[in-house]
């Protein structure tokens, strides 16, 4: 495969525009936030980056790769990213689905025959599906940090584990409970369906097309002079964590990558928004990538991580496909995942509606830099460096809005093409009285301001009038011809 043309095409796609590039003062605050965290967290090495408009706009390495050699961390230093690896496995499954090679709703035993003899916790339990494994709803027990230490398990040992079966925490499909074992099983599905190891499949089908040449799973084969070695902080000093070789559980947490490589991954994911008519330019379709934010039906409502800001913030959160999806009170939709591993901690925040991502990798056991990453995102938001791209006004919405203007100018609801519900909900005479009352209160309105689309079928507007402002909403009916099913008008507060 010719990588350069594909990468160039990927980076040339349209991204939602930032309100403004991060200014020097904001970047200085972000740098200080990460630097302070590294010292307080006793992380030997740290690298972080900000991706916007399809490129790495800011990246910085702090500390050292190796406490003995004092080699400084750079954007090309290799870190293990632990559970942030799950996103690669999830997209590998979705790619195989797109290629017609598996079904998300098929029993997992269809692709892993060792599961066929399993004993389920209740007689009315349905069989585990591939989708259950992706969304952590298979009924397995939460297995941190047991799962991390299974990294070195051989494929033969994993086969025996699968054949023996595992105890269930609950019946499949009843709740979300995080399972590294489940994602290791997805790795086996990738291997069985593709005919390659999951490592080779993900490198060939996802990493290589994105130009992630330094990324992979086998840390013992990586350039050792570029690796950030893992440490734990114990008794006031750094203690080297032993490297765990690649194994069967790597599908849940085995990826090693650099900031330079990972920025390509983040840019690719963000390029899936907004939905548009542009040619496809990546290893998976944009619509497939957007599936990662479709959460399972087990929402939570936690408070935002303590220490991120002085403002309390309750979030809505669910787990989707290799990602947590959060609705934040300040940042809006955030697609995120952390990684914790012996010797490493990591986090990524995607703000898909703004086309911006923040990520960070550290070389301390379970020392994930979530706190400074969230603070960095809030600093970008406060600086006006995040902006949701406006939706285009569809031709049908433009026609509906012009009809709403005609209603106002003529004082008659029947001046617009109406869906059959409108006059049943409020007759023409009542509409006439309502419009007249509004005109008496606000006077003449030029109605020249544009409509703001909230979808292809609906929009809002504000008109400046002689004695105030009028706000409104216009909504098309789901009919082939443009008809209005709703027109709301009200006087804006002073």
Question: What would you call each of these model-derived segments?
Answer:
Residues 22-79, 101-103, 114-118, 155, ...:
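Short, conserved catalytic-motif segment at the N-terminal edge
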Residues 14-16:
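N-terminal signal peptide c-region/cleavage motif recognized by signal peptidases
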């Amino acid at each position: 495969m010719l990588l350069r043309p594909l990468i160039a095409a990927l980076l040339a796609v349209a991204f939602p525009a930032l309100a403004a590039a991060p200014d020097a003062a904001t970047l200085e605050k972000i740098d200080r936030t990460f630097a302070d965290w590294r010292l307080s967290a006793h992380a030997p090495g740290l690298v972080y980056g900000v991706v916007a408009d399809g490129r790495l706009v800011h990246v910085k390495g702090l500390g050292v790769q190796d406490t003995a050699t004092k080699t400084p961390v750079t954007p090309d230093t290799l870190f293990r990213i632990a559970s942030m690896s799950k996103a690669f496995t999830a997209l590998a499954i979705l790619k195989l689905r797109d290629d017609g090679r598996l079904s998300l709703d098929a029993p997992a035993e269809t692709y892993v025959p060792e599961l066929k003899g399993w004993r389920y916790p209740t007689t009315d339990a349905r069989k585990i599906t591939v989708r259950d494994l992706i969304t952590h709803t298979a009924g397995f027990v939460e297995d941190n940090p047991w799962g991390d230490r299974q990294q070195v398990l051989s494929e033969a040992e994993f086969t025996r584990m699968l054949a023996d079966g595992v105890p269930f925490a609950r019946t499949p499909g009843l709740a979300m409970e995080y399972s590294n074992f489940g994602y290791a099983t997805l790795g086996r599905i990738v291997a069985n369906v593709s005919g390659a190891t999951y490592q080779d499949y993900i490198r060939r089908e996802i990493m290589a097309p994105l130009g992630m040449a330094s990324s992979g799973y086998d840390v013992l084969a990586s350039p050792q002079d570029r690796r950030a070695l893992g440490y734990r902080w114990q008794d006031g000093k750094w203690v080297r964590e032993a490297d765990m070789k690649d194994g069967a559980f790597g599908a849940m947490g085995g990826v090693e990558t650099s900031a330079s490589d990972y920025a390509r991954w983040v840019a690719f994911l963000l390029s899936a928004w907004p939905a548009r008519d542009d040619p496809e330019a990546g290893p998976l379709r944009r619509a497939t990538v957007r599936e990662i934010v479709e959460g399972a039906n087990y929402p939570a409502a936690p408070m935002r991580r303590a220490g991120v800001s002085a403002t309390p913030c309750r979030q809505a959160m669910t787990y989707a496909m290799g990602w947590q999806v959060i609705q934040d009170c300040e940042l809006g939709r955030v697609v995120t995942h952390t990684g914790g591993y012996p010797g490493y901690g990591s986090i990524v925040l995607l703000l898909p509606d703004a086309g911006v991502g923040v990520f960070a990798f550290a070389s301390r056991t379970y020392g994930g830099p979530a706190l400074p990453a969230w603070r960095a995102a809030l600093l970008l938001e406060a600086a006006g460096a995040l902006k949701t791209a406006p939706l285009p006004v569809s031709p049908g919405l433009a026609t509906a809005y012009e009809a709403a203007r005609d209603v106002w100018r003529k004082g008659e609801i029947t001046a617009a093409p109406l869906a059959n519900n409108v006059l049943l909900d409020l007759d023409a005479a009542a509409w006439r009285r309502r419009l007249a009352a509004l005109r008496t209160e606000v006077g003449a309105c030029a109605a020249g301001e544009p409509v703001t689309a909230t979808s292809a079928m609906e929009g809002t507007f504000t008109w400046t009038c002689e004695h105030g402002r009028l706000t409104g909403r216009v909504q098309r009916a789901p009919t082939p011809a443009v008809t209005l099913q709703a027109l709301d008008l009200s006087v804006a507060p002073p």
